[in-house]
Amino acid sequence: MFVDDPSLHTLKRRRLEITDSMEASSSAQAKIADMREKLGREVRVFETSSISQRPSQVSSADDESDDFYEFTPADFYRLLATKKEDKSLKTRKIREAEEAARRSKLTKAVIRVRFPDNHTLEATFHPSEKIQGLIDLVKRVVAHPDVPFYLYTTPPKKQIKDFSQDFYSAGFVPGAIVYFSNDQPKDDGGSSTPYLNEEILSLKDLEAMTKAVEPVESSSEPATVDSSAVPVEHERKSTEKKTTKPKWFKM
């Protein structure tokens, strides 16, 4: 007599879910690759909360506290003394060689552009690239490229005007956060339309899809236990317990 096992239906459903997730992940990865090829660089889009919108300019790894980056008077005098020592002990060629060595170790600049609607565009540049490349990228991804805009850093608020400067000279290496501003009109209700176009905003959902398949795959193989082995293991443990001598027994 055939008995319908509900566990088989559960297993089939899991396999279908895994297949669908893998197909969605593969499609999302393909779209992300197409966007990377279209824009000529690796980009990410994510949404940040208003609490995390603290004006700062940091590297791509935000692990240190604010006190770590505070410039104290002691740091100033130490830096001044170091500069005087460098001028007296090092020739111009030596300083240039050291600067070139430091620069050669830095291979990328991770720039995050934060928009007023809490969306952040992250793009990777080479330190020797010009800031004009960032301006051109923003023009391609905003929803209204015809509306004039500008980028600025803070604090203090300083508009970026020299687009011919490279990221290294601007101090944007290994990473920096810049802010976007324009004269985009707001609705009567006070809400504004998205600053990024729909195509680039879709990257936020696509990246989530590529990560969503990972926990599903981890549960794709249900744990199977050989029922015949359970009593044997239990019996072996019981035997071991019986053969063990009590602590109080002495020969």
UniProtKB/Swiss-Prot annotation:
Q: Does the keyword Cytoplasm apply?
A: yes
Q: Name one Pfam family in it.
A: UBX
Q: Where is the composition biased (Basic and acidic residues)?
A: 232-243
Q: Which residues form the UBX domain?
A: 104-180
Give any GO molecular function from the UniProt entry: ATPase binding
Keyword Cytoplasm present in the record's keywords: the answer is: yes
Cellular component GO terms held in the UniProt record = cytoplasm
Q: What happens when the gene is disrupted?
A: Accelerated growth of various plant organs including roots and inflorescence shoots.
Q: Where in the cell is it found?
A: Cytoplasm
Region ranges (Disordered): 212-251
Keyword set, alphabetical order: Acetylation, Cytoplasm, Ubl conjugation pathway
Q: Spell out the InterPro entries in the cross-references.
A: PUX1, Ubiquitin-like_domsf, UBX_dom
Role noted for this protein: Regulates CDC48A by inhibiting its ATPase activity and by promoting the disassembly of the active hexamer.
Subunit structure, interactors included: Interacts with CDC48A (non-hexameric) via its UBX-containing C-terminal domain.
PANTHER family registered for this protein in UniProt: PLANT UBX DOMAIN-CONTAINING PROTEIN 1
Q: What is this protein called?
A: Plant UBX domain-containing protein 1
**Taxonomic source organism:** Arabidopsis thaliana
The encoding gene is PUX1
